[in-house]
A protein has these predicted regions:
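Short S/T/G/P-rich N-terminal loop/turn motif that feeds into the first structured element of a domain
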Residues: 1-57, 65-69, 99
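Charge-dense polyanion-binding interfaces
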Residues: 85-99
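Active-site scaffold segments
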Residues: 61
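Conserved short hydrophobic interaction patches
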Residues: 25-29, 76, 89
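C-terminal structural segments of small proteins and small subunits
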Residues: 64-88
């Protein structure tokens, strides 16, 4: 299954230092056990189209071999460290899980 998470950072957290810390956190969360593969990125500079949304600041893309492994990731301490450490930066978070 695929776990996609989109983050919108609050305006006051757009500075380079905060972004660097957040990116380090994204790197760490991609290393949590049970993840088959993980990566993150920023909106791609593709041509504007009515169907694309580039309003987010970061996207996190995690693959799991099963829903059970996804569920184990959700309660892993490193996941909690990420959420607790960065939740105050977020204006909005959108999760899309695909099977």
């Amino acid at each position: 299954m695929q776990h996609h998470v989109y983050f919108w950072l609050k305006e006051e957290h757009q500075d380079a230092e905060t972004r660097a810390a957040f990116e380090k956190g994204l790197d760490a969360v991609c290393q949590v056990p049970n993840i088959a593969s993980g990566n993150w990125g920023k909106p791609a500079p593709t041509p504007e189209r009515p169907v694309t949304d580039k309003s987010f600041d970061y996207g996190l893309y995690l693959s799991f071999d099963s829903i059970e492994k996804h569920d184990a990731y959700q309660v892993h301490p490193e996941h909690d460290v990420f959420v607790d450490g960065f939740k105050d930066l977020w204006e909005k978070v959108l999760v899309m899980d695909v099977e």
